[in-house]
Amino acid sequence: MTIHTTTAGRTAAPAGAAAAAPAGTPAGAPAGAEAGAAAGAAAGAPRAVRSRGALRLGLLTAPVAVLLALLSLLHLLQGTSELSPAEVWQALTGTLTGSTAEASAVIIDARLPRLFAGLAVGAALGLSGGILQSITRNSLASPDTLGVNAGAYFALTAVAAFGVSLPFFSSAGVAFAGGLLAAGLVIGLSTGPHSSPIRMVLAGSVIALGLAALTSMLLLFFPWQTQGLFAWGAGSLSQAGIQGVITLLPVLASAAAALLLFGRRLDALQLGDDAATSLGVRVRAWQAVFLVIAVVCTAVAVTIAGPVGFVGLCAPALTRLLVGFFPGLTRQRSLIVVSALLGAFLVIGADVLMRALLGSQNGVSVPTGVVTSIIGAVFLATLACTARSGFDSDSLVTMRAGTGFGLRHPVLLITICAGLLMAVIAGSVLVGDAMLLGGDVVNWLTDQASVRIEIILETRVPRVFAAVLGGLSLALAGAILQGVTRNPLADPGVLGISAAAATGAVAAIVITGTTSFWAILCAALTGASAVGLVLFGISARTGLDHARMVLAGISISAAAAALTTLMLVHTDPWNQTKAMTWLAGSTYGATAVECLPMIIAIVVTGAVLSAVSRDLDLVQMDDTTPQVLGVHVGRTRSVLVACALVLVAAATISVGTIAFLGLVAPHAARLLIGRTHRHLLPLTGLLGALLLTIADAIGRTVIAPSQIPAGLITAVIGCPYFIWLLWRMRRS
């Protein structure tokens, strides 16, 4: 503080102190009185600022609260029973009598629990998303993108699968443990000196994919114990009563109170680690505290309604967009309150919209999370285009490629891999729920086998060849996409192309009722092509880098999965289980007819690739070099992408959606033989066929007679590899 002194050596009042004195102060009043008046005015200034901030917050929250109340009343009017607004009001006030008294039971036992569940889930996810975005200083962070929802859902499914019956409150504890472990793993893997928003979200999204694969395994292995969890897993507000919601409301209220109480610490964390430490805040300890609170909120939401997608991303992000109009939202207490209100508004609004579009009867069976996932996927893709990624643009070219042996003897290495594939095919034919001998196969080929052996091999051999052809197709598609986009993270599954193909196939079956294999194939190709055009069109116009393109693909996968769920919940349980098995990536039920499209696709695209392999070598470098050497980059890229889409559609219709295979196989081939596509593509195809054939054999054998879809095994293998690849690619 600067001290002003007079020439007589006395301490003078700070400049302007007299002006700060209240009106009416006598001119001859002592200097101490003037100083006291100035201090009082200075102390009153922060109170005035806080009052104005509270007023602005009230002006914002009041309209949102009013709209939420009106939306809640509209929500109560929707349902399978036709009730007038007057009857709803009388039921709420307890004035219904006589023959109309049953309307009161409808409101109290069915509609109010659904409404309260939506309000609680939306508020909980809004709170959780706001906290996660604040402590990570990452606008893309949410319970979905950090794997918290997936961890909580997996934990609850595991408990149900093994027959453990828990009270509602204890289930929330299980969800909390699963969500906390997932969030801790994501944050531990993605933080550090080279962290970035995209890195963290990619790590969380891929871990969520891995956990989803494990959850799908449990749903398939224990269909009776986990009955009803499929629709619930997409985020369903259907409730058996209001007691479960009431049980968890104190937990949610306690978490919200803790956030309001410690809001100043959360404000300090926004200043950065160094600034917060200088203010006396123990950064790591308080980040851990707030992480626990966020996971508690998510656990409450997942226990009530399952993982409702992307509400925790959209609500805080929408709140931050209002900061320009309401500066008080920079305070975490204000942001948390508004995020909770907007979260509840989004969930109730999605439920109202869904039942308005689909009708009350169908709206009850469709999970609300389907609508929020579609909206949130668009939101995530939009945010991904503006976020900092932290990845180099030329990381595919600069990554290590080729071994000494592979570079010197590429043809010999390809021959060895082909021989290994033949051996694996022979072994795969022999293993499964019934072990066979080589003589059994010989007898079958010469029409001398028993009826039992004929039945086994007539179903097993097409499966083996479907795995070989599917792995070869997806691996080639992955190598093409990585070369065309110069993106080491590119994969048909990760980019959403496989999910879109599956959505197209399911739409053809459910909507049109067709059973024609070729019609379903055309629908799958249409879905894959639509996503490919959108993804690569946006990339060409906006210059998406590696990580942003992958994140956009993940958001497309989420939207496609939501649409697929929307269609599947209307099918019977038998077809639902069959569809889940196929969507998980299984060769179950494959026939020779289903292998034919893959054979055609491989032959045609193989001929094209052999002609343009040199051009692909140049395209993977940059855009300038191939143009200088006379290569038409746009035309070459279009032809190659078309080849990849055809391969993905043919493989998806035969073996379902299989993620990470198109990522792992090209990288393994590149490490062995180098970047020259004349040798890289054949080896990639062989390695892809090898991997999927082994995965299929493992899935048919380890828990026989039950089976694990091959796609789930490749997901469990590919998820750690993707995380390792992210770690290698961080900016140095």
Features from the language model and the residues they span:
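Alpha-helical transmembrane segments in inner-membrane proteins
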Residues: T2-G16, A20-T25, G40-S732
